[in-house]
Amino acid sequence: MKKHWIAPAILVFSRLLLLLALPLEGMVGYGDFIHFFRIANLAGWPYIHYWSEFPPIFPFLGELIYRLSAGRETTFDTLLILVLTVADALNLYLFSRLADRLFQKEEARVRLGGYLLCLAGLAYTWWYFDSIAVLAMLLGLLWILEQQPVRAGVALGLGILIKWFPVLLIPLAIKKTGWRKGVLTGIIAIGLSALVYGGLALASPKFTAASLQSQSAKGSWETPWALLDGNLTTGNFGPEIERLDARTASRTDRNPAVIPTWVTLLVFGGLGLATFLRLKVQTDRQIISFGLITFGLFFLWSPGWSPQWILYFLPPILLALPIQTAALLGGTIILANLMEWPVLLSRGMFWTLPMTIGIRTLLMILLVVAAFQSVSGGRE
C-alpha cells in the first residue's frame, strides 16, 4: 500500500515548489482560471440562477471555492490549484495500482514514472479541471477490472457529472464483466447523473435546459469537421455575463455543420459497434486497449476538441500499448497539442489550425490502430 503513495508524494512536493517559487500569474498561465473565477463571481448558483457549459459538479465546486475565498481571486486560484493537485496525486495512486495489476514490478515502475513525468510537467493538469474527471475515470476503470459493478457505476456517474467522457467506459465494463454486470454499471452511472440533472431541472428548468443545450448548440471547433465548416476558432463561449440569460446558451456565431452530426455519428457509431462485437478481449490490458479504441473513435467523430483532453488518453496509452509505442505516440501527441495551445493559438495564429488539426488527427488514427493491434494479438 505504501509504495503506491511514493509517486503522488513526489508530485505534490513538485507542485508545491512551483506554487511557492512562481508568481501566481505564471501558474495560472494560459489556462481557464480567469474564466472559472468570473463564472463563480456571477450572482447565485450554477444551473439555478445562470447556465453553465460544464456538467454540474465543477461549477458547484467552483462556487464553493469562490465563497471560501471570500471573492479574492488570488485565494480562489490557489485553492483551485491545490484541489487539482490532490486530484492528480490520486490519479497517480490509481495508476500505480493499475500498473501493478498489469505488469511486472520493473515495467510498472517505468510506466508510473512516465505518467508522473506527464502530470508534473504538463500544465494542462493545473490550467483546467479535467484532472478531476480523469480521477473518476481511473477509479471506475479500477473497479471495472476488479469486477465491482456498483462501485464502478457510482464512479462513472460522478465522472459524467464532471465531464461527459467517462460514459465511454460503459462498453468497456460490458466487455470485462459481461452483459449483466456491465449493464448494471451503465444503469447506475447514467441513473445517478439523470437523478442529479432531474433534481436541478426541478429547481430551475430554464437554466438546467440551457446548460444541457449549450455544448451541442455552439458548433464545431479545432477538428477536421470545424475546418470543413469554416470554423477556425477555439471552443470558448461568449462573455461570462451572458450566462445570466438562458437564451444565450443556444446562440452561436459559428457556421452550421456541412455534414450533420447525426450522419457522422452513424458512421463512427457503426465502427464502434462493429469493433465491440468483433474484438475478443481476454486480458485486462486488452480491455484497456479496447477502451482506448472507444475514446479514439469518439474524438475522431466529435465536432470539437480541446487540447487539455489529451489528459484522458495518457493513462490508457501508458497502460495498454507497448512501452516504446506509448512513449512515441504519447510524447508526440502531447507536443502536437501544446503546439496548438498555447504556442500558436494564444498568439492569434489561427491560420495554423489546418496544420495542427491534421497532425493531431493523424496521430489519433495511429493511436486507434496501435490499440487495435494490441487487442487483436499485436505486440505486447
Language-model features: where?
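Juxtamembrane membrane-water interface segments that cap and precede transmembrane helices
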Residues: 63-75, 236-255
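Compositionally biased, intrinsically disordered low-complexity regions
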Residues: 11, 221, 237-240
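Multi-pass membrane glycosyltransferase architecture that uses lipid-linked
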Residues: 1-219, 257-380
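Proline-centered turn/helix-capping motifs that create local helix->coil transitions or kinks
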Residues: 203, 233-238
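Short alpha-helix
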Residues: 224, 228
